[in-house]
């Protein structure tokens, strides 16, 4: 099993040290090709790594603020794009066709049912004009939409709004997220990588540069329905357990999928926490 080989190479040499120190969270700064690999999906022969430890990926910006925030009930700004779109821009190397996302509206409705202080914007209401100025008012910004990494030009990688507009990584760096704890990109492709893997943390870096403490993104295209299950579990845990860190809530949500019929790492391991989820 490749995941077990990588565990033996990366974790086994320090496993006893982690146990002796009673480590609860692995703060991970992957380099080059290791950025392709979700640490959660490594296996010790009995358990997945995420079943033993929380995982927090970091960028250089993460190192400037690793303080833990006081626990409080979250406020969420949630936007979703459920419609199919074709994106064409002069500065993009090609056009991109996106299928409908059948489960995202249900995902947002479930989040709002658990966290009443949630503002929901769907399709034509989910525009940059309606969304970007409001983000700084919320602790969590959640986008259930398509994203695309543009190979060779990662600064033009983008997420799709519900009216067909896009926000590139450059645009994200100008967002005002100083009071935002977490930006969740619950989308089909928000952290796909190429080359040395520099793009994967480029997203987290852009979100943090704009002021947010952390981001959650995905390493590969994820099934729409399993994403809904994981994300609603994540928010339920955060809402019902205010003492949970972001890293712990994501860990428990991933474990819930491990214990379900969607237990293959394809479904739960690509979700990465980038930044400060402590």
Language-model segments: which ranges?
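Short glycine-rich His-centered loop
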Residues: 72-100
């Amino acid at each position: 099993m490749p995941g077990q080989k990588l565990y033996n190479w990366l974790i086994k040499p320090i496993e006893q040290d982690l146990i002796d120190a009673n480590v609860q969270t692995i703060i991970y700064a992957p380099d080059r090709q290791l950025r392709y690999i979700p640490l959660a999906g490594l296996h010790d022969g009995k358990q997945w790594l995420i079943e033993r430890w929380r995982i927090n990926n970091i960028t250089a910006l993460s190192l400037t603020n690793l303080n833990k925030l006081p626990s409080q009930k979250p406020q969420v700004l949630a936007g979703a794009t459920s419609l199919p779109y074709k994106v064409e821009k002069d500065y993009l190397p090609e056009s991109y066709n996106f299928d409908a996302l059948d489960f995202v509206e249900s995902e947002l409705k479930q989040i709002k049912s658990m966290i009443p202080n949630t503002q929901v914007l769907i399709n034509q209401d989910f525009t940059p004009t309606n969304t970007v100025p409001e983000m700084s008012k919320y602790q969590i910004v959640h986008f259930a939409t398509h994203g695309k990494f543009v190979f060779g030009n990662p600064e033009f990688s983008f997420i799709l709004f519900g009216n067909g507009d896009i926000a590139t990584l450059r645009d994200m760096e100008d967002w005002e997220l100083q009071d935002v704890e977490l930006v969740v990109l619950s989308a089909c492709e928000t952290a796909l990588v190429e080359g040395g893997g520099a793009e994967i943390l480029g997203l987290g870096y852009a979100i943090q540069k704009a002021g947010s403490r952390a981001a959650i993104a995905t390493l590969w295209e994820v099934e729409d329905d399993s994403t809904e299950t994981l994300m609603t579990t994540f928010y339920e845990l955060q809402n019902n357990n205010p003492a949970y860190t972001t890293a712990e809530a994501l860990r428990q949500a991933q474990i819930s999928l491990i214990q379900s019929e969607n237990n293959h790492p394809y479904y739960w391991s690509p979700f990465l926490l980038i930044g400060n989820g402590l």
